Amino acid sequence: MLQDPDSDQPLNSLDVKPLRKPRIPMETFRKVGIPIIIALLSLASIIIVVVLIKVILDKYYFLCGQPLHFIPRKQLCDGELDCPLGEDEEHCVKSFPEGPAVAVRLSKDRSTLQVLDSATGNWFSACFDNFTEALAETACRQMGYSSKPTFRAVEIGPDQDLDVVEITENSQELRMRNSSGPCLSGSLVSLHCLACGKSLKTPRVVGVEEASVDSWPWQVSIQYDKQHVCGGSILDPHWVLTAAHCFRKHTDVFNWKVRAGSDKLGSFPSLAVAKIIIIEFNPMYPKDNDIALMKLQFPLTFSGTVRPICLPFFDEELTPATPLWIIGWGFTKQNGGKMSDILLQASVQVIDSTRCNADDAYQGEVTEKMMCAGIPEGGVDTCQGDSGGPLMYQSDQWHVVGIVSWGYGCGGPSTPGVYTKVSAYLNWIYNVWKAEL
């Protein structure tokens, strides 16, 4: 066995000292480590400053393009072009006129289809003879629906008051067949443009109580800068129904979000809004037209906790004392109350409009495009934060018959809640939808 001639220690000696890792000299740390730490801290500080600047700019300023410059955010949607290309007025709440009458409608008599003869102004019931899926799709498109419809034959009833005619299509609209004879099938067309108004759970008829999203899967929270402002109702994958007065203070679309799928505020993801559309203001009736449609940037995926509610039928006239439901996260007391974190529900009833307009109530302020609901003795009502939410009626499905609009106080016996009557605005809703197809 060879041995290093310069070594004093034999190779087979057990007296071997372990090797030690060399220590990093303090001078090296001072020269390399400290500058690296300083650089990292400086970079972190710069990032924090940049983020803070961006947050401040996004909150208080809007960036115009060509040329790039900032304008105060309060100048957004003020009706004046402050950016050279007008970007500051693009993403704003827009008004939409009522428009022409939509020439198809659905009746509360089993959702039967009626068609307008534009030449005479008369309405006719659609006979089931030769009615096809293509005609059903045309009818629903005329009302602005994009989903696949369903239809069936229902027997002509003894109270049928409209003439029954065969239907054809011309220029993507339904028309009466010129040579239409008697309705040989003896059946009308029952049409459903969207599966709606079905929930997983039926509410109990009691006073005010905590609600479950399983009972009201169409209820949404409409929020500005992450703060709940109003309620709303899902009508289809793209559209949410609410009140126009929710957007009086903030008419820019950017910071509005919709939250769906939960009965707890803030516990569900937000959805971006593409458009907010209101009806044109009528100075003669300033409290009329309190209705708005929000178009979502991306369509909703329906589930057990996210579903649409049905629109009312055009002839849905509810008599006094008809039971209805209200829901919302609004204030639990008129004075000194606070917003509820949990969705609340309550049973109310239709209040006669004559009683609602009495001298000790609203003194004629409630118009034909509004309706009143509450309980005669008072104490159950919508309040601040419930605005825009649905007033609901259940037949075979749930229908949104009203939108929480206004009132004097919350829960007074002579001043019940006043609601936008949705059936009065069906034509406007259909025209908006058609324009956005």
From Swiss-Prot:
Chief location of this protein within or outside the cell: membrane
Domain Peptidase S1 residues, every copy: 205-434
Keyword Transmembrane helix: yes
Any one Gene Ontology cellular component term annotated for this protein: membrane
Membrane-spanning residues: 33-53
Feature type site, description Cleavage: 204-205
Biological-process GO terms, alphabetical: negative regulation of growth rate; positive regulation of viral entry into host cell; protein processing; proteolysis; regulation of gene expression; response to wounding
Glycosylation site residues: 130, 178
Matching Pfam families: SRCR_2, Trypsin
Tissue expression pattern: High levels in pancreatic, gastric, colorectal and ampullary cancer. Very weak expression in normal gastrointestinal and urogenital tract. Coexpressed with ACE2 within mature enterocytes.
Extracellular side: 54-437
Effect upon mutating residue 290 to A: Abolishes protease activity
Disulfide bonds: 64-83, 77-92, 127-183, 140-193, 196-310, 230-246, 356-372, 383-410
LDL-receptor class A domain span: 61-93
Modification after translation (UniProt): Proteolytically processed; probably by an autocatalytic mechanism.
Topology feature Cytoplasmic, residues: 1-32
Residue ranges of every copy of the SRCR domain listed in the record: 94-204
Similarity field: Belongs to the peptidase S1 family.
Biological function: Plasma membrane-anchored serine protease that directly induces processing of pro-uPA/PLAU into the active form through proteolytic activity. Seems to be capable of activating ENaC. (Microbial infection) In gut epithelial cells, facilitates human coronavirus SARS-CoV-2 infection through, at least, the cleavage of coronavirus spike glycoproteins which activates the glycoprotein for host cell entry.
Protein name listed in UniProt: Transmembrane protease serine 4
